[in-house]
Amino acid sequence: VAAPLPRYWTWFDVVSNALGYLPLGVLLALGFLAAFPRRAWLLMATAVALGAALSFILEGLQGFLPTRRPSNIDFVLNTLGTAAGVVVGWGMHRLGVLDALERARTAWLLPHAGAGLVLLAIWPLSLLFPTPVPFGVGHVLDRLQDTVAELLEGTAFAGFVAPSDPVFEPLGGRLEFMAVTTSVFAVCMLAFAVTRRGWHRLLLAPMVLAIGIGVSALSAAITWGPTHAMAWLTPAAEHGLWWAGALALLLAWLPGRLAATLGLMAFAAALMVVNQAPEDPYYADALKIWEQGRFIQFHGLTRWIGWLWPFAAMAVMLRSAAARS
């Protein structure tokens, strides 16, 4: 802690280290205040201390890793992020935000909607890691094929699985349109599968589109720069977004089970198209920036979320479609 401050740092490191611990502070504050509402200041101080202790332990453990170095400025920023989150959580408690959310949950959500809500909350993270086509999460076939071929190399089964061919024909506007339409429509159906029928569903589809566009723009901006934030929005992608939103609004009256069934079909179609997408030079450069550049701390988590998210969503929707009313 008393070591000199690091000579080299970036604003990305400052913001990410502070924001990364903000949700922890919010959750700790809300949990403590819900259990012991009369000891607010003591609980808030305890929450900040717990966040600081967690950061201190994790920074200390980095000293045992060959490629990592502990940083006192990271510890300070993590602690400040926790403190900011505690203040936000205290404000939410004072304003009765939790009570309002509980009433909205009862009015909007179906029973046992927890897994679907978690997946909807994680979906923006899956879009952060570069994809070969907009909203094209679940692009795992090439990696899986290469991994299996590498594992079988030198065995009697070496010829059964060949490494993926890096040369592909361009995906084409029609397939890109189909990939975007089915991917976004499937997320809308996941949202419908966990909510009750009503006017609020008419808000969910625009919210899904707005969040998806915003996170995709953020991913492009932090990869290529702010001037290229909307470079991913090709005419095919734009038309796909319009069609996905329009179809979702037309089907907002569907029962949850039927929405889950349609979403399951849409996810299957999206995965089939996305895994045909080529790894063009721009996509390869984006991967290199994330895997070897300043986002190296985050690429592993976001990559795995992007790979596995649609399959987890399909499992949840399969359970919803098969459940009894």
Language model region names:
Residues 1-67, 72, 83-325:
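Bulky hydrophobic segments
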Residues 76-79:
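Long, hydrophobic, well-ordered secondary-structure blocks that form the structural core
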